[in-house]
């Protein structure tokens, strides 16, 4: 099973992906559940991630191509081998973040991004949880964690992008609305577990 968490920076998806990993590891064993993230997930990718996030004014198409190349490396080295071994993979960000951020946020053609994604991966998530949180709360939380601040209009476009992605992919995407990531951690986790149990009889 392949589960992804999506949302704007500071939405709480990293916390929720970790909590779900801990729960499923208790059920299926730590060796059968993999928690990973994008951009990153391999030693090489983590090094490139640090370089990208410390580089200012990088051309947006160049940035996209870096992300796509990193996704291929991550998919072939981590995600696909784990799924082939029947493990549960939980990923903090995947293809939808690229569409929301680079497409809706930065204005790159979403069709181009989708075609590039199709070029580098051939397995897609079974379940994607999209955390839809208040932009001001999320940005404040993101800044506290040391992430680069982008203007509120940018995050509004990204948020709209995630909502559109959910509408177009209702077979796998679930929008978790009105998220206050600082207060409802256990309540939100229960929603994920209930959804997964219903869909896959875990």
From Swiss-Prot:
Q: Which GO terms describe its biological process?
A: dTDP biosynthetic process; dTTP biosynthetic process; dUDP biosynthetic process
The enzyme's main class, written as a single word, is transferase
Q: What are its GO cellular component terms? A: cytosol
Q: Does the keyword Magnesium apply?
A: no
Name the job this protein performs.
Phosphorylation of dTMP to form dTDP in both de novo and salvage pathways of dTTP synthesis.
The protein's name is Thymidylate kinase
Similarity comment text for this entry: Belongs to the thymidylate kinase family.
Known catalytic reactions: dTMP + ATP = dTDP + ADP
Q: Which UniProt keywords apply?
A: ATP-binding, Kinase, Nucleotide biosynthesis, Nucleotide-binding, Transferase
PROSITE patterns listed in its UniProt record:
THYMIDYLATE_KINASE (PS01331)
């Amino acid at each position: 099973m392949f589960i992804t968490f999506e949302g704007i920076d500071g939405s709480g998806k990293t916390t929720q992906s970790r909590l779900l990993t801990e729960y499923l590891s208790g059920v299926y064993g730590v060796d059968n559940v993999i928690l990973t993230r994008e951009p990153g997930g391999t030693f090489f990718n983590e090094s490139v991630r640090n370089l990208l996030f410390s580089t200012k004014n990088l051309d947006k198409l160049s940035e996209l191509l870096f992300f796509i190349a990193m996704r291929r490396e991550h998919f072939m080295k981590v995600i696909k081998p784990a799924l082939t071994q029947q493990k549960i993979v939980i990923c903090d960000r995947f293809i939808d973040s690229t569409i929301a951020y680079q497409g809706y946020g930065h204005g790159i053609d979403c069709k181009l991004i989708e075609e590039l994604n199709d070029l580098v991966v051939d397995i897609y998530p079974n379940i994607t949880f999209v955390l839809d949180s208040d932009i001001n709360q999320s940005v404040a939380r993101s800044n506290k964690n040391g992430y680069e601040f982008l203007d509120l209009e940018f995050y509004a476009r990204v948020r709209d992008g995630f909502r559109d992605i959910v509408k177009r992919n209702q077979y796998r995407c679930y929008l978790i609305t009105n998220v206050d990531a600082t207060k409802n951690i256990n309540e939100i986790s229960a929603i994920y577990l209930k959804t997964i149990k219903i869909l896959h009889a875990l």
